Amino acid sequence: MKIVVKVGGSAIVQGLDAQRFKDYADVIKQLAEDHTILIVIGGGTPARDYINVSKQLGANNSILDYIGIGVSRLNARLLISALGDIAYPEPPYDYKDAGLAMYSGKVVVMGGVVPGQTTDAVAAILAEYVHADLLIRTTSVDGVFTADPKLDPKATKIDSMTPQELVDMVTKIEMTAGANNIFDPLGAQIVKRSRIPTVVVNGKQPENLIKAVKGEPIGTIIKE
């Protein structure tokens, strides 16, 4: 299969622990033995820290977006280092470059692309561009919930939903540079348009990627 994985920054780069990158690299190496893998990595806490400081310095939203993109590309380079020779050596700057890099036979790792697009949207657009068979979105919780489980103890996990239900849910969420949400509105719209099966899993356990690829009941499945 051709698989695009959105690795949430909150799942891998919080605290910038080298072991987390190694753990993800080990799982990705296993998947790459049988599948074509493209990774989009978010900015995580480091991006939000830089963005918060930039806000205090008076930076506008476009500048904040560029800062987030820059940090996500640094995170991509860290994962490339952890993957070693199986990784394409440079994070692509756009979807066309990523598509071309894919034909090298290497694992492609990239960050953000343009202002106004979160890495959720980048992953969804990339999946559509390369005709992926599966999109996996990792996050810091066990899937999509009826509310933020960190704030609402009554929130329940949704085992499966349609792309339209995802769109309806996320359009109520305000998106800002560095925002940490389950999915962004543009990404959700692309998932709906492309009809690519999508699974949202807890990224704190990298092995969940393998379970999602195997079709095991994990996280939230988004499909028609």
UniProtKB/Swiss-Prot annotation:
Signal peptide: none
UniProt record similarity statement: Belongs to the UMP kinase family.
Enzyme Commission number, as recorded: 2.7.4.22
Description of activity control: Inhibited by UTP.
GO BP terms in the entry: 'de novo' CTP biosynthetic process; UDP biosynthetic process
Subunit details: Homohexamer.
Domain of life of the organism encoding this protein: Archaea
Keyword Hydrolase recorded: no
EC top class named in words: transferase
Function: Catalyzes the reversible phosphorylation of UMP to UDP.
Stored Gene3D superfamilies: Acetylglutamate kinase-like
UniProt source species: Methanocella arvoryzae (strain DSM 22066 / NBRC 105507 / MRE50)
Single GO term (MF): ATP binding
Sections of the chain in a coiled coil: none
Binding site for ATP: G9, S10, G44, R48, T139, F145, D148
Lineage, opening ranks: Archaea, Methanobacteriati, Methanobacteriota, Stenosarchaea group, Methanomicrobia
Compartments it resides in: Cytoplasm
Substrates-to-products reaction catalysed: UMP + ATP = UDP + ADP
Biochemical pathway: Pyrimidine metabolism; CTP biosynthesis via de novo pathway; UDP from UMP (UMPK route): step 1/1
Entries under Pfam families matching the protein: AA_kinase (PF00696)
InterPro entries with a match to the protein in the record: AceGlu_kinase-like_sf, Asp/Glu/Uridylate_kinase, Uridylate_kinase, Uridylate_kinase_arch/spir
Protein name (database record): Uridylate kinase
UniProt keyword annotation of ATP-binding present: yes
GO annotations of cellular component type: cytoplasm
UniProt: UMP binding residues: G43, D65, V113, V114, P115, G116, Q117, T118, T119
